[in-house]
């Protein structure tokens, strides 16, 4: 089974980062307030205007992006965790 987002939605595979304090305590992503990172795995076709014309998304599969910690909806496809969100929930592309 594969997943294809609709319209202006994208699917992101989160990049998990664990950091340690100087004392060796691991701080999981769930305890951090900074933006999250991920790789786009699928994109929708784009948005439609009032005339029915489709505007394609600016983001593309393979882009590494920053997004807000609470953005989107978490799903699981074939055991892989994905976040589905609208394109405008993405903060930016990491080069």
From Swiss-Prot:
Assembly description: Heptamer of 7 subunits arranged in a ring. Interacts with the chaperonin GroEL.
Species the sequence originates in: Rickettsia canadensis (strain McKiel)
HAMAP family: CH10
GO biological processes: chaperone cofactor-dependent protein refolding
PROSITE patterns: CHAPERONINS_CPN10
Job of this protein: Together with the chaperonin GroEL, plays an essential role in assisting protein folding. The GroEL-GroES system forms a nano-cage that allows encapsulation of the non-native substrate proteins and provides a physical environment optimized to promote and accelerate protein folding. GroES binds to the apical surface of the GroEL ring, thereby capping the opening of the GroEL channel.
Similarity field: Belongs to the GroES chaperonin family.
Gene3D superfamilies with a match to the protein in the record: GroES chaperonin (2.30.33.40)
Record NCBIfam families: PRK00364.1-2 (NF001527), PRK00364.1-5 (NF001529), PRK00364.2-2 (NF001531), PRK00364.2-4 (NF001533)
Main localisation: cytoplasm
PANTHER family: 10 KDA HEAT SHOCK PROTEIN, 20 KDA CHAPERONIN, CHLOROPLASTIC
One annotated Gene Ontology cellular component of this protein: cytoplasm
GO molecular function, one term: protein folding chaperone
Keywords noted in UniProt: Chaperone, Cytoplasm
Lineage top rank: taxon: Bacteria
Keyword Lyase: no
Pfam families with a match to the protein in the record: Cpn10
Location(s), subcellular: Cytoplasm
Name of the protein in question: Co-chaperonin GroES
This protein's record includes keyword Thylakoid: no
């Amino acid at each position: 089974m594969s997943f294809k987002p609709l319209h202006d939605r994208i699917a992101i595979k989160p990049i998990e980062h664990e950091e340690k304090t100087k004392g060796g305590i691991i701080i999981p992503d769930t305890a951090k307030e900074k933006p999250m990172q991920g790789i786009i795995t699928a994109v929708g076709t784009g948005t439609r205007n009032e005339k029915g014309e489709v505007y394609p998304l600016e983001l593309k599969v393979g882009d590494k992006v920053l997004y807000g910690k609470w953005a989107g909806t978490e799903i699981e496809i074939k055991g892989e965790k994905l976040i589905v969100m609208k394109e405008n929930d993405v903060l930016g592309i990491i080069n």
